[in-house]
Amino acid sequence: VAAAQMGAGIVECDVAFTKDRELVCRHAQNDLHTTTNIVAVPELNAKCTQPFVPADPASGTPARAECRTSDITLAEFKSLKGKMDAYNPMATTPEEYLAGTADWRTDLYASRGTLMTHKESIDLFKALGVKFTPELKSPVVDMPFEGDYSQQDYARQMIQDYIDAGVKPE
């Protein structure tokens, strides 16, 4: 919305997929641990490729986590709250990990971000009157995903969302 309000004529949705093969907008398939509250939700953190591991100050080992859209279902994805992309590598708790925004950035929107499906982005962009372009993200998981969801299936599904929404190619 901010991009359209600031005059952007073309807005994009970076498309990734969930465990149940629903398309969502994400900068990367594996950025949920730094862009959402997933590590602070125990039942979802447990599903992450690498659940949150606290830093070890004694050894200097940084905190780590890796949470992918393909680790969770669409319903679980939609339950998350978006935040500024940041983390605290010296965190010993999930809350500290999420509070890693650099001083020169703002946390004004840190806990209120709404995560969107690809279909929701199409509807929003149409309502805003902007042009849009999808970016099909390269999966970080092996394809075909879970044995039968190929890169071609993923691309076809994205295109089908536009067809279903009545978007004509230009």
Residue ranges and their predicted role:
Residues 1-170:
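Phosphate-group recognition and catalysis centered on beta-loop-alpha active-site segments
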